[in-house]
């Protein structure tokens, strides 16, 4: 049985906009979230939820990012919850990257209803392509805080892309969801590896496909298709050091880039236009 994209997302939109007191909801992020919670009593949704959400909103209050990025927006729950938290922390921009155009449209409508249009911007398309555009356009040169909750094999490839572009540096914070269930062994292995271990792996050259080790076939193929590959072949930057903490039972891995070790031995962002792409 499908647990998403079976019409329930549009039903949510009709449920919320069909409320008799819709005027009282307008401009109030929490009331929009409350309505999503109410609808979830009858329908399962792949939202971050209240418990994991608090871990991230506490992180936002601590980091106080000027700009935050999320990979995987679904129907906008996280964009509303975290976008509001970013604004309250003094931030100015929240980018929500979503592959599915229908989900992105729903997110836009709910963000508008919540009164967060001034801070939340939804980008439709592949996350790797959108990250590249954010960097090359000059809109985001440095990742302050990034919430990762999209295509599971894309966690590590998108992180390596950000590393390659120079978007990750000391002070960057990553919050990756669902690393325990359904699980993401390749991502956990990477952010927990030493610089020496990553340098050794990098000698094999860039990865030309998604690393799906330990990821179920359903999870690996549900969103992107069996033969899908990353747009860019990248090694990343193995010289970056991460300090990681796994929040249990939430299954949310928070990784802090603490330092950079050694000279730059791999390609820099200036050579990006010469990098193999698909």
Please tell me what each predicted stretch does.
Residues 73, 119-186:
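Active-site segment flanking the S-adenosylmethionine/decSAM binding pocket
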Residues 1-29:
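N-terminal auxiliary segments of SAM/dcSAM-dependent transferases
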Residues 44-132:
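SAM cofactor-binding core of SAM-dependent methyltransferases
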Residues 6, 23-27, 41-54:
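Conserved SAM-binding loop and adjacent beta-strand
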Residues 154-278:
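C-terminal substrate-binding/active-site "lid" region of AdoMet-derived donor-dependent transferases
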Residues 7, 11, 31, 77, ...:
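Short alpha-helical
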Residues 85-86, 111-114, 138, 165-166, ...:
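Active-site catalytic pocket residues across diverse enzymes, especially alpha/beta-hydrolases
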Residues 2, 81, 106-108, 132-135, ...:
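Short, well-ordered secondary-structure micro-motifs
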């Amino acid at each position: 049985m499908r647990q998403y994209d079976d019409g329930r997302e549009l039903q949510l939109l009709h449920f919320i906009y069909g409320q008799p007191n819709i005027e009282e909801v307008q401009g109030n992020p929490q009331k929009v979230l409350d309505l999503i919670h109410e609808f979830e009593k009858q329908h399962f949704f792949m939202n971050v939820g209240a418990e994991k959400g608090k871990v991230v909103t506490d992180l936002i209050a601590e980091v106080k990012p000027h700009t935050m990025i999320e990979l995987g927006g679904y129907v906008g729950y996280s964009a509303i919850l975290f976008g509001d938290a970013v604004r309250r922390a003094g931030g100015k921009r929240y980018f929500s990257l979503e592959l599915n155009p229908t989900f992105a449209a729903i997110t836009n409508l709910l963000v508008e209803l919540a009164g967060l249009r001034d801070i939340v911007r939804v980008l439709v398309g592949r996350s790797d392509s959108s990250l590249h555009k954010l960097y090359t356009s000059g809109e985001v040169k440095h990742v302050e805080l990034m919430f990762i909750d999209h295509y599971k094999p894309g966690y590590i490839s998108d992180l390596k892309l950000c590393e390659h572009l120079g978007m990750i540096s000391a002070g960057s914070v990553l919050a990756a969801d669902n690393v325990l269930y359904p699980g993401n062994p390749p991502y956990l292995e990477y952010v927990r590896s030493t610089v020496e271990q990553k340098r050794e792996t990098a000698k094999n050259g860039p990865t030309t496909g998604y690393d799906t080790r330990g990821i179920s076939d359903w999870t690996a193929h549900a969103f992107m298709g069996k033969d899908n590959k990353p747009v860019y072949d990248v090694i990343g930057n193995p010289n970056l050091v991460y300090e990681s903490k796994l929040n249990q039972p939430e299954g949310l891995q928070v990784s802090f880039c603490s330092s950079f070790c050694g000279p730059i031995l791999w390609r820099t962002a200036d050579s990006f236009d010469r990098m193999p792409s698909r």
